[in-house]
Amino acid sequence: MLYNRLLLASNSKSMIEKGMKSMRRDYNTYLRQFHEAKWDEEIIFDLSVPGQRGILVPQPDEAIVEEVGNGVEDIPITMRRKKAPALPEVHQMRVNRHYMRLTQEVLGADITPDISQGTCTMKYSPKVQEHLVSQNPNLVDVHPLQDPSTMQGILEIYKKVEEMVCEISGMDAFNFHSGGGAAACYTGACVVRAYHESRGDTKRDEIITTIFSHPCDAGAPATAGYKVITLMPDENGVPSLDAMKAALSERTAAIFITNPEDTGIFNPRIKEYVDAAHAVGALCYYDQANVNGIMGITRAKETGFDIIHYNLHKTFSSPHGGMGPGCGALGVQEFLKPFLPVPRVEFNGKDYYLDYNCPQSIGKVREFMGNAHILVRVYMWIKQMGA
């Protein structure tokens, strides 16, 4: 037994060293050197062996069962399974080996960028989309300064994607210029300021957020010059309504909230927060970084939010890309539309055109109109989902 363990440790060290060597980066080209996997791994259901177990589900103590019951009896009969779920029966070592081999098989698919981290869930990015956006001359050969009459296709996609995400969110207008979620959050903070200033309400210099909201909900408004108030959770895991009301005042410009929060928990008090903020004249900003968990179940409009952003490079199946490229889609209710960045893509019944005639706009937030290829991926993915 001891010999086998030592042999396994020795082999593991050798395998790790070989793996490190195969993944060594060439700093002349900044590309990784890697070897292709020499196997074709089966799907995990084909590896199933009746009776194998990776873990043993812990059983409750008898005292707990006597106090609260076994739990199953409380589930309505109509909701109980008639037979056990068809899950693969695989021991722990085989599971580890299986997923390790899968990662090695896809190692060369996207070798150039590093894999970045995110607190929000990512979707799969179909390779058919990558082929189109990287090789189709109708996209890759378009220059943003050419005449709009010569790029009607991409302008139509801009407009169609806007209509789609408006329907999904309940918002009335979207802007796709921001290069990511935090950039959209900053743009949103600027829109909030422009709205209050248009009404002569210049004393509102505070933004309220929660500790488990996306970090940019505090960072972006602070960068825009706001004082940020961060609420902490109570014993239920979310800030109390009383804490929110105590923080709100005539100086509150908006609340910036992520929901579900970065803990993965949906905040059930969100509608109460929105109503309390509106009662003091503040706007409500919805960071939808974690919207995958509630997509198609509820919309920002029904909760009462005035302004939101989606991360198109996460929620709508465009690659996360290792810090870029991305697209932060900023959506607003109709009364905030005049403040969105320019230019806006509009349709006059015949042609798509760029509208710069927006006197209340906050102006441009970046060069040109954002990352157009992201919107092509989004358009394809939404269509593939049945839109």
Question: Which residues are covered by each model-predicted region?
Answer:
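Structural motif of enzymes handling amino- and sulfur-group chemistry
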Residues: 352-387
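N-terminal glycine-rich, Lys/His-bearing helix-loop that initiates the first secondary-structure elements
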Residues: 2-141
